[in-house]
């Protein structure tokens, strides 16, 4: 028993010695701060809050500008006809315009593709597993998200319409660049790049396939463009009518 007591006593001495040599780190603020440090910390917190408010306001202005363009292009009108919840329509119209402009493609082509792929059903799943508005395959979505610098996470995240439009539009733009035309890209979007190369390599297969899915999307796109042009013409005539009245 005396041996244990001596050992404990020695341990206490050693711990005390080590503690003296290496002081315990006390959390910041526990010992109090110099007034100037505390004041600086408060200023930084205030500036951080102001920055967050400014960024939120900037995002609001950008969203408003994108939605105005969506109205002018006929995107908002097409989305309103989708049957989606009203609270989603504005955000989707903004997402389509923003992602299309980011990828340098016509926003109405994105709308046409969504109509043909999912009929604006956020939760559409094809027989082969393509998901969401633009029917993005999970593996393709993961690859595109990694390429864009973020993680897709669960494949069900493809049901998020903004994520789906972000990835689907980037994929369409990539295919247009790789295949050299919208029609060729649509073949690849529908059949996959590997099979698309084989389809496009043979005239008979190419003509037959082009008459299906690509023709359907292009027809929808042209219909949307015609509606857009009529709307632009009507807006151009309105000031003249107003002056005559």
Q: Which role fits each region the language model picked out?
A:
Residues 1-9:
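Bacterial N-terminal signal peptides that target proteins for export
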Residues 11-12, 127:
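Sterically constrained small-residue positions within well-ordered secondary structures
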Residues 14-46:
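Acidic, low-complexity intrinsically disordered segments
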Residues 21-31, 48-51, 234-243:
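Intrinsically disordered, low-complexity polar segments enriched in Ser/Thr/Pro and acidic
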Residues 37, 44, 48-51, 55-58, ...:
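Heptad-repeat positions
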Residues 58-245:
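Catalytic glycan-binding domains that act on GlcNAc-containing polysaccharides
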